[in-house]
């Protein structure tokens, strides 16, 4: 199993964000969380990516407990948060090179990810000059740099126009293959 969640609960004060959530995701599956605003979807993703801890229950990614083996989980997960943290004054390639240094990833992997996400025509531009769709692609490229086993994307299509929506879904589908 790539992801195993058992009885996860999370409270923010008196507000219950997650209540006894359980599920599993097998390698190769592409799944989505559906629910209204405030249903706990982003909270669950933050737990799975070790940004926050659950109050109760257990979650594993590739057999690693997210509350015990944070480093192993982080190495095996690529995460695109809802609010994509980009440095708008950096060039696309420069930004990816910076992130690649953090993961100790080769220059050839940067080129692979640029190609995979369709960023080649925009790779010479500053991130601040890009459309929302291309900024999402930069975030996705960053999440893919270290060739993670698991990819967690929080609202990757929010704010995209219909054409960009189709394009980013196709990129995600191709990455999942």
Predicted stretch roles:
Residues 3, 10-177:
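ABC transporter nucleotide-binding domains
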């Amino acid at each position: 199993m790539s992801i195993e969640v058992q009885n996860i609960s999370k409270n923010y004060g008196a507000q219950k964000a997650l209540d006894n959530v359980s599920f599993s995701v097998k390698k190769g599956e592409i799944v989505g969380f559906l629910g209204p605003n405030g249903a706990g979807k982003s909270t669950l993703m933050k737990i799975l990516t070790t940004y926050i801890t659950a109050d109760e229950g257990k979650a594993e990614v590739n057999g690693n407990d997210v509350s015990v083996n944070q480093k192993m989980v982080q190495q095996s997960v690529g995460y695109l948060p809802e609010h994509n943290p980009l440095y708008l004054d950096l060039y696309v390639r420069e930004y990816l090179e910076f992130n690649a240094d953090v993961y100790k990833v080769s220059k050839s992997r940067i080129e692979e990810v640029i190609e995979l996400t369709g960023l080649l025509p925009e790779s010479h531009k500053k991130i601040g000059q890009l459309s929302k769709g291309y900024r999402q692609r930069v975030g996705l490229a960053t999440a893919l740099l270290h060739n993670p086993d698991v990819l967690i994307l929080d609202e990757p299509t929010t704010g995209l126009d219909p054409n960009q929506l189709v394009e980013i879904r196709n990129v995600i589908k191709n990455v999942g293959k």
